[in-house]
């Protein structure tokens, strides 16, 4: 076996799947309702992550605060993500995956009700902790469920493309509110309505679906207690490296999509309405990249293509550092969205192949929940940096994050040689 796959042995699904028949869309029959519910959860996640960045200027004005202070909202959200990441396996094993989804959705909805009221800033910050906790539980669940379906790689690409669609919609709604002089609180009213629909789709979609069926089988097969299984899953190298990679990746993604609006309007003096549409186009690029570039990554090899895309992102960020032209910066930001697209679903797909199936709920849930915390942690750090050095420091911070991604990606195991496509077609 190739040296890049040293963490994979003959007993992992990665090797076993090579001998199985080709999967088809017929294999998804019976999963359609649940899959649609998971897709909608992904859109909710995107709506959530795309919201705060698009309303930062108005929230700053409402509370009369600085970039450093408002960045605390990202930190509070990250705290909620990390709490859920630490307890996700425990919660799922004790109340089941479906109840964990309901718990996450209910906590998320409660947070939106608080946020729409415009309470004092400390209350808003506390609500962001709850929002992060709820979102992390749902994020982990939708990734675990989808990663174990037939055609998992394609379904994950669609799942995360819909995340991008959700994140694209948020700036459009925020821009509409700005154009019609409606308070930023309207964004959270909109999110609360979407969250109510989410609880309905979960109820209908997962009705009769045995999400926890595999746990009993896996525990019997592996002769391990749940505690030992959870520990082994989290300490697996794929889990640790994958979680760190996704942590930085999601941070990079949301820093550009979140602080990008402030960067373009305050740093490059772009028109607020037009720049809101640019950020929507960034998220649309992300959604498109997850399908189009995800296909290229699968065809030519994930390790090679993701490395190429990452290096191209570094080039784009360098252009942002040296050019003050708002049109060029806008174009580059949209391009970054396209290039970032396939990275999350590709990592989750590789994890589902490398890890034993008994690890999937805990390991993929941990990768997703901890990694999604990057959507709050790194925007917080970037906000602190921009408060000290100015918003034009944002692309420099993103370059550092992207270099970290490049190093971690080189450490992630793969089922193909680095130049697998070219070796195969010699």
Residue spans of the language-model regions?
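Helix-breaking motifs and short loop linkers at transmembrane-helix boundaries and internal kinks
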Residues: 64, 96, 117-122, 269, ...
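Helix-to-loop junctions at the C-terminal end of transmembrane segments
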Residues: 84-97, 289-302, 386
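Helix-loop-helix hairpin linking two adjacent transmembrane segments in secondary transporters
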Residues: 152, 158-213
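Conserved MFS/SLC helix-loop-helix module at the cytosolic interface between two early adjacent transmembrane helices
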Residues: 83-122
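Extracytoplasmic gate region of multi-pass secondary transporters
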Residues: 52-53, 235-288
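C-terminal transmembrane helical hairpin of 12-TM major facilitator-type secondary transporters
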Residues: 300-347
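Intracellular juxtamembrane helix-capping segments at the cytosolic ends
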Residues: 136-150, 342-356
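Cytosolic juxtamembrane N-terminal segment immediately preceding the first transmembrane helix
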Residues: 1-41, 45, 230-232
